[in-house]
Amino acid sequence: MRLTAKQVTWLKVCLHLAGLLPFLWLAWAINHGGLGADPVKDIQHFTGRTALKFLLATLLITPLARYAKQPLLIRTRRLLGLWCFAWATLHLTSYALLELGVNNLALLGKELITRPYLTLGIISWVILLALAFTSTQAMQRKLGKHWQQLHNFVYLVAILAPIHYLWSVKIISPQPLIYAGLAVLLLALRYKKLLSLFNQLRKQVHNKLSL
């Protein structure tokens, strides 16, 4: 039985709640001592993990819609992607304001360059910013064939973000490995498309070097 448009609308409502409830929990934890001994790190890790969850959920939609024969599920993909960007922005903001502090924001650029895991993080965020900004149907029409080329960069984020997470923790625990494994699995489901994109990129580079 296929989902109807009305059911997908209610599913979107549930997904919005799924994006909002972690924020409400975090606000409660901050105000009621629900965080650990290092609340700043806890906030950074929580916001980062939540962004990663929404990234993985976004990547899950296409194969799920295909294998479950639920084409209308695709309508939830943009919503999940925007929540991913929102939580990634909270993650970046928590680092800038809580780790560095308002008086040391001038150091942000230096930190992003000198710490490789932060470099991967900011590259991922910039890509997500571009994808969020161009996610509307109006931008899709305006960009034409270039829209899909741009949005294929989500696969690069799926590689960089788990590495950023693994690199940022001092002690490797099962959790970041699980996220990395899920990202690899979701990318593996698209191996034909990724191989095609890689071959196209290699051909373009070869043509430019041959000039």
Swiss-Prot record:
Keywords attached to this entry: Cell inner membrane, Cell membrane, Electron transport, Flavoprotein, FMN, Heme, Iron, Membrane, Metal-binding, Transmembrane, Transmembrane helix, Transport
* Location of this chain's protein in the cell: Cell inner membrane
Q: Subunit structure, per the record?
A: Heterodimer of a catalytic subunit (MsrP) and a heme-binding subunit (MsrQ).
The protein's required cofactor(s) are namely: FMN; heme b
What the entry lists under HAMAP family is as follows:
MsrQ (MF_01207)
Family under the similarity heading: Belongs to the MsrQ family.
The UniProt GO MF terms for this protein read: electron transfer activity; FMN binding; heme binding; metal ion binding; oxidoreductase activity, acting on diphenols and related substances as donors
Q: Name one GO biological process term.
A: protein repair
One Pfam match, by short name?
A: Ferric_reduct
Cofactor binding summary note: Binds 1 FMN per subunit.
Which coarse location class applies to the principal site listed for this UniProt protein?
A: membrane
Q: Name one GO cellular component term.
A: plasma membrane
Please name the InterPro entries in this protein's record: Fe3_Rdtase_TM_dom, MsrQ-like
Q: Does the keyword Coiled coil apply?
A: no
Q: Where are the transmembrane segments?
A: 10-30, 82-102, 116-136, 153-173, 178-198
Which membrane topology term applies here? Multi-pass membrane protein
**What is the protein's known function?**
Part of the MsrPQ system that repairs oxidized periplasmic proteins containing methionine sulfoxide residues (Met-O), using respiratory chain electrons. Thus protects these proteins from oxidative-stress damage caused by reactive species of oxygen and chlorine generated by the host defense mechanisms. MsrPQ is essential for the maintenance of envelope integrity under bleach stress, rescuing a wide series of structurally unrelated periplasmic proteins from methionine oxidation, including the primary periplasmic chaperone SurA and the lipoprotein Pal.
Protein name from the UniProt record: Protein-methionine-sulfoxide reductase heme-binding subunit MsrQ
The UniProt record lists the keyword Protein biosynthesis: no
